[in-house]
Swiss-Prot record:
InterPro entries: ATPase_NBD, Type_III_PanK. ATP binds at D6, C7, G8, N9, T10, N11, T12, V13, T132. GO terms for biological process: coenzyme A biosynthetic process. Substrate binds at G107, P108, D109, R110, T184. This is Type III pantothenate kinase. The lineage of its organism: Bacteria, Pseudomonadati, Pseudomonadota, Alphaproteobacteria, Rhodobacterales. GO terms for cellular component: cytoplasm.
Amino acid sequence: MLLCIDCGNTNTVFSIWDGESWLCTMRTSTHHSRTADAYFTWFSTLLGHYGIDPQIDDVIISSTVPRVVFNLRVFCDRFFNLRPLVVGKPDCALPMEPRVDFGTGVGPDRLANAVGAFARHGGDCVVVDFGTATNFDVVAEDGAYVGGVIAPGVNLSLEALALGAAALPHVDITKPDAVIGTNTVACIQSGVFWGYVGLIEGITTRIKAEYGKPMKVIGTGGLAPLFAQGEVLFDTVEDDLTMYGLTVIHKYNKDKNPS
């Protein structure tokens, strides 16, 4: 079985793929100092809760936090005797080549999203990923990643507002019943929710106009279902797109190097 690890700035997700479907998905907060032993304790405890004892044959990692990769490598080596495939490293081949400015690095999560989107839907699409940042990733007709947009994430915006404005509280994001708020919390929720609806609509409209061809819009990330409620922002929402992209990248590398 394949263990897929997606480490972002806020959360780290472990998912186990049996070749056809996900056995389980586990999420924890990202900590730079978390040790390999701590990862194993957390991982094995949750596996016991799920009542499964999978045979992990391979591991693939996508991480936007370089400092965490070392401890994840130690975790894989110590407890599975495996050398993980790390997206973005020279020994990890991609089924497509990014067409971006020379010397520009592309986040491994964005590459995985592009690969997953192309595998499921073909090209000419834009992936909107709600993470610490809100990313818009454009996938060309041939599957190449050709660029995108990075905007502040929803929760990051809420935190910045609470930190920067002494009189404003930190609130949780939800879809307001109305645009006009009648109390401070409702006003903040309305501003952030409807502000991001406008952001998504505006940026995807401009991307489509600049691209010059019809495009599918795919939502992913933890908050995508919230923003899809009653709004025509996405053609589809897929909460496992990044992880699915990792399975495609892993298979591509195994097919290239079957040994």
